């Protein structure tokens, strides 16, 4: 057990909002680059995550910063912390 009450830093991810049709929920596309094991070429991989947007402030095309939280529903484990860039 850890005697001091230090918490692990929260995991944060930046992504692009691709849908805001649900109430208090946005779908965020998170892209990352991985290196191919054999050829060494960098490949783009993407993941779609659902995030909690309590005030319904996000619009499609916004870039948001999310943090991991305890499960809010079956598919929501992320919460929108801030809107980094607004869509034009």
Swiss-Prot record:
It holds the Pfam family Ribosomal_S17. The keyword Transmembrane does not apply. It comes from the Bacteria. GO terms for biological process: translation. InterPro entries: NA-bd_OB-fold (IPR012340), Ribosomal_uS17 (IPR000266), Ribosomal_uS17_bact/chlr (IPR019984). Keywords: Ribonucleoprotein, Ribosomal protein, RNA-binding, rRNA-binding. GO terms for cellular component: cytosolic small ribosomal subunit. One of its GO terms (molecular function) is rRNA binding. PANTHER family: 40S RIBOSOMAL PROTEIN S11 FAMILY MEMBER, SMALL RIBOSOMAL SUBUNIT PROTEIN US17M. Belongs to the universal ribosomal protein uS17 family. This is Small ribosomal subunit protein uS17.
């Amino acid at each position: 057990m850890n005697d001091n009450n230090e918490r692990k830093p929260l995991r944060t991810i930046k992504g692009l909002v691709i849908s805001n049709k649900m109430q208090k929920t946005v779908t965020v596309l998170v892209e990352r680059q991985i290196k191919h094991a054999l050829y060494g070429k960098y490949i783009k991989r993407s993941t779609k995550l659902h995030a909690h947007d309590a005030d319904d402030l996000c619009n499609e095309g916004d870039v948001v910063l999310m943090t991991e939280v305890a499960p809010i529903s079956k598919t929501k484990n992320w919460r929108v912390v801030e809107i980094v860039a607004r869509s034009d």
